[in-house]
Amino acid sequence: MMASHGKAGPGSFGLEANLENAIRNVLNITEFYPPQAEGIENGLTGGNLMLSIPTASGKSAVAYVCMLQKILNNKGSKGIYVVPLKALAKEKFVEISALSEELNLKSSLAVGDRGSEVGSLQDWDILVCTSERLDSLIRSKQDFLDTVGCLVIDEFHLIDDHGRGPTLEIIISRARHENPNCQIIALSATVGNANKVAEWLDAKLVTSEWRPVELRSGTFSDLILKIHRVDSKNPVQLPNPRSVTGNPNHGLRALISDTLEENGQALVFVNSRASAQKEARELSKHLIRESNKEGRASADKISLWNEVSTKLVGADENTSMGKALSECVAGGVGFHHAGLSPRQRDIVEEAFKEGV
């Protein structure tokens, strides 16, 4: 077990040698963040664990390590990784299937969409699924949970959600009743009632405000950007408010242009599919105009936009939605909503991750 001080890498926890290698090779982790190390140390005891730490602090890696170690240590034991959204399930499946391949384990994806499901539901070591799909599987097969040694619930704070909460509660209650030996690992953003929820789960609570990157929260009005709060692992003085160049009647365009000039990226949230497409279309036109100005966008950047744009009107995506998305992406802006095809979503998400 890890010492209570000092740095902790994959070799600090007494893991199976092939799992240590998989962590390094697949997850590219040579040293865990402090809250990750504490979570792994507690999770490897086999008891229930609730990990409540900020976004991007590496919660999933903790669950992967604990779940895989349990499967490797207990022959015939299975693991289930539950997420709220199909897109998130596919993202986690890519990571888990890569880890599984290193460990000679079988992984499957179940999201309720036959065209998107991967692997066999009859022969798996690790299943990645949405909460609704797992609820359906449990109801249709009485002994489905009998061999599950570890159940991971990602985005656990959604148990308070009126739509998804009841399904999550039923899944957890059935798992605890039908298979008391099943370890439950709940991954959550920081929440106010973490102690009470952990008590309900009979789980060890690991919570932290530590985050690997600085998070700034602020407001933007009348072309003035004001930072009100900075969350960082080190004390930071609030920066002075600053003005952003642009048209005060088009504040969003000004803020996006300012962000891109700093080599940053932006996510803009709106309340409907139509609004997402409209804003993307207008921002794309604006950025194309801006890119024609000297120094605003490199030829390499424009080439990357065009490359992604071309993918979106390929043989399989030559639809009105594909064309609309392609036109927006040619200006460096995409839109993302439930009306996109799986391939369109994949292309847009991958382009954003790569900083295109």
List the model feature ranges, each with a label.
Residues T45-L51, S77-G79, W124-D125, C182-Q183, ...:
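Pre-Walker A (Motif I) flank of P-loop NTPase domains
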Residues G76-C129, R133-S136:
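Conserved nucleic-acid-binding Ia/Ib motif block in the N-terminal RecA-like helicase ATPase lobe
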Residues G119-D123, I138-L151, C328, R345, ...:
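Short basic/glycine-enriched coil/helix segment immediately N-terminal to the Walker B
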Residues Y81, F93, S97-S108, S275-V356:
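Conserved C-terminal RecA-like helicase domain
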Residues E41-L49, S60-K75, E95-S97, S173-A175:
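Walker A/P-loop NTP-binding motif
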Residues L127, S131-D135, K141-I184:
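SF2 helicase catalytic motif II
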Residues M1-M50, G76-S77, K285, S291-A330:
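Helicase-associated low-complexity/disordered flanking segments
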